[in-house]
A protein has these predicted regions:
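Extracytoplasmic gate region of multi-pass secondary transporters
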Residues: 52, 256-305, 399-402
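Central cavity-lining transmembrane alpha-helices of secondary-active solute carriers
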Residues: 76-95, 114-116, 300-313
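Cytoplasmic membrane-interface "Motif A"-like loop-to-helix N-cap segments
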Residues: 99-111, 319-330
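C-terminal ends and interior cores of transmembrane alpha-helices
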Residues: 111-129, 331-346
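Glycine-rich segments within core transmembrane alpha-helices of 12-TM secondary carriers
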Residues: 170-194, 217, 390-402
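Multi-pass alpha-helical transporter architecture, strongest
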Residues: 221-228, 425-447
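C-terminal transmembrane helical hairpin of 12-TM major facilitator-type secondary transporters
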Residues: 323-369
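A late C-terminal transmembrane helix in Major Facilitator Superfamily
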Residues: 381-412
Length: 447
């Protein structure tokens, strides 16, 4: 029997000795881990969201002005290239994180992401250096993606391993809330720059400002992470000589089913969230004709409010389990996406657009406990490797090209409602994964 199937049923699995109850006070280690994970995911998704938000403005600077629709599609395709590099980054950093510790790798990933983003802010344009400009942009996006491949699931693993049983859902959801807030901050920054510049200034140099601001955000996160110790679970692994020489290979050989389920649920998670976080701004500005400044401000507000629901979903998952919340996320998102897109395309009121967008985003936040469950599927010796591999394999399909595919659907059908077909399809995949996954919410963290 494989290690993946050779497990004690959840209902009778004993808690590990000394495991804290859900009522035990959080330790300083757990609090520091949660804050560091939260700030790190803010930086990660600020970096990624900034590109998506300025894609419409950036497109002619790197891909020409002869065909504006083609330039936007090219810019969104470059957005997807960063995700293509994520699986390799997940494999490399996951392997290193299981061998040498979570903290060291999390410092490396956030530094790499931040510096790549800042360099985008100083790139020459197509008019200045010709085809070298889009090539450099693609290389930096690949660098971002490679580093990001080791970031989120490493942060989730670190927080899980520093948190008492019964509190893992709430604290890891706070880490994941940082992803949504990172996007909101990016929208706020882009909206602010748009407000104080003319359209000509924004096209000439204003788009660079949000990328350059990645640098101070990265330095703050580095200061926090450099003060951390490694997770108690990893320290215990070292003390008991449990660190494996090839954790990535062990994960693939011993837990293939868990990796596939992780990838399947991630397809739904990332496609649903990225259509909301990245493509909606393109749809509202380019297709539906809303003012860009209004869209950025509305997006920032809606996403910030929706982010507040993330810890609520995490708390619910600690009480009722991960699977019920995962099912609500997939079914709820699929159910509301068509009405939301219809409401957006049938009104000229940015307030109505914002309210519809908020409904959609609240349901997408319910996916957060699913990523916690993904990490909980693996024992600590391969947790970073296995979860990062599964997550990043899924994100290539779900996150990389969901905005691009949405734009193509609208372009080919002429209907602003057509991206709903994509979301319903990926949510069906996520629902199948949620139903098949074992419940981990109330079980002790696997050793």
């Amino acid at each position: 029997m494989s290690p993946e199937n050779d497990r004690v049923p959840t209902a009778i699995r004993p808690a590990r000795p000394g495991a804290a109850s859900s009522h035990e006070k959080l330790t300083p280690t757990a609090r520091r881990a949660s804050v560091a994970g939260f700030v790190g995911t803010i930086v990660e998704y600020y970096d990624f969201a900034t590109y998506g938000l300025v894609a419409v403005i950036l497109a002619p600077q790197f891909f020409g002005t002869e065909n504006s629709a083609a330039a936007v599609l090219a810019a969104l395709a470059v957005f997807g290239t960063a995700y293509v590099a994520r699986p390799l980054g997940g494999m490399v950093f996951g392997h290193l994180g299981d061998r040498y510790g979570r903290r060291t790798i999390l410092v490396t990933t956030i530094a790499s992401m931040g510096f790549c983003s800042a360099l985008i802010g100083v790139l020459p344009t197509l008019d200045q250096v010709g085809l070298v400009a889009p090539v450099l942009l693609i290389l930096l996006r690949l660098g971002q993606g490679f580093a990001a491949g080791g970031e989120l699931m490493g942060a989730v693993a670190y927080v899980l391993e520093s948190t008492p049983n019964g509190r893992r859902g709430i604290l890891t959801s706070i880490t994941q809330m940082g992803a949504t807030l990172g996007f909101s901050i990016a929208a706020l920054v882009v909206g602010s720059v748009t407000a104080v510049t003319t359209s000509e200034q924004m096209s000439a140099w204003g788009w660079r400002v949000p990328f350059l601001l990645c640098l101070p955000l990265t330095l703050v996160c580095l200061a926090l992470r450099l003060r951390l110790e490694d997770s108690p679970e990893f320290a215990d692994m070292v003390a008991n000589s449990e660190v494996k020489r090839a954790p990535l290979l062990d994960a693939v050989r011993q837990y293939p089913g868990a990796i596939v389920k992780a990838a399947a649920f991630t397809i739904a998670t990332t496609a649903a969230s990225h259509v909301g976080l990245v493509y909606m701004s393109v749809l509202l500005i380019k297709t539906l004709g809303f003012d860009s400044q209004s869209v950025y401000w509305t997006t920032a507000l809606v996403v910030a409010v929706a982010a507040l629901s993330t810890p609520v979903w995490g708390t619910i998952s600690d009480r009722v389990g991960r699977r019920p919340v995962m099912i609500v996320a997939t079914v709820g998102t699929a159910a509301v996406v068509y009405p939301v897109l219809w409401a957006m395309s049938s009104t000229s009121s940015i307030v109505v657009v914002g309210m519809a967008f908020l409904v959609y985003m609240i349901f997408t936040q319910a996916f957060a406990p699913g990523l916690t469950a993904v990490s909980e599927l693996f024992p600590r010796r391969v947790r970073y490797s296995g979860s990062a591999l599964g997550y990043n394999a899924g994100i290539v399909v779900g996150g990389a090209f969901a905005p691009y595919m949405s734009a193509q659907l609208v372009e080919s059908t002429g209907s602003a409602l057509s991206p709903a077909l994509l979301i319903v399809a990926v949510c069906a995949i996520g629902l199948a994964a949620a139903i098949s996954i074992r419940e981990t919410g109330k079980a002790a963290l696997r050793k």
